[in-house]
């Protein structure tokens, strides 16, 4: 059985290079798709201080996945409640 590797996590652990990214706070999959092509290492979808709900997160994650680029998505949930984390995981 093969194990999935999180390349962003591995690169952060290695510490060999600076990693650059942006916060996505507009709730728009078109913006997420455009920024996926900008060459950032990571893109963080913010649910804490931005108007991103579960549907917005899912659509932005689909846009990032469809881009087939190395930008790794990260989601910041608005709290530590398990149901919030589960919703983000269910979104992708």
Regions flagged by a language model, labelled:
Residues 1-92:
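Expand to "…catalyze enediolate/carbanion chemistry for C-C bond making/breaking, isomerization
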């Amino acid at each position: 059985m093969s194990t999935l590797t999180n390349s962003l996590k591995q690169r952060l652990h290695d510490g060999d290079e600076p990693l650059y990214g942006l916060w996505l706070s507009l709730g728009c999959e078109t913006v997420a798709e455009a920024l996926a092509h900008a060459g950032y290492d990571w893109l963080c979808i913010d649910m804490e201080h931005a108007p991103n709900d579960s549907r917005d997160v899912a659509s932005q994650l689909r846009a990032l996945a469809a881009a087939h680029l190395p930008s790794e998505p990260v989601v910041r949930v608005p709290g530590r409640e398990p149901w919030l984390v589960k919703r983000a995981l269910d979104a992708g």
